[in-house]
């Protein structure tokens, strides 16, 4: 690994920085994945393995201490010392100041316009609609591997464009079933719906025409 690579996260390529992304280490010894990526892997994707060696990690410790090793800490249940907080969902230990300033912010259901907070995503979505006439995408909320604070909000015209074509960041729109007129998060979701709820023609199959679906056999 080059010196430049060692200064950036193995997954997102953002630099390690005490206030934003700190190094994490597991019992395997690898420390090249940042706190945000590890938190996303473990709490949202439910992937508890090391991104480098794939070893399953019961716990991960995030620290801005230079050269910190897993063996430097003694774990007593959910405690490794007064300076750290245990995040139960991800089974990660964070320094208290970092957990308050960054981790809690990522999980907060906070309006990006008026800064009011709500109890859950449903209430936040209702708040945007009622107070700001803006939309959150339910398909993205249910399927996108993102923290609540990373979910986008849209003006009505932009929301329709988001559904049909996607966003300027290169993300695709949500494809619509031509029979049900219902949208799905991505092409995989649409394909699974078509295969489960609609019909193929055995004559088309024999002719080598694949992935052609019909509303019914009439």
Language-model features, listed with the residues they occupy:
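Ubiquitin/ubiquitin-like proteostasis machinery centered on ERAD and p97/Cdc48
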Residues: 59-102
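Cytosolic, low-complexity regulatory segments enriched in Ser/Pro/Gly with interspersed Lys/Arg
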Residues: 55-57
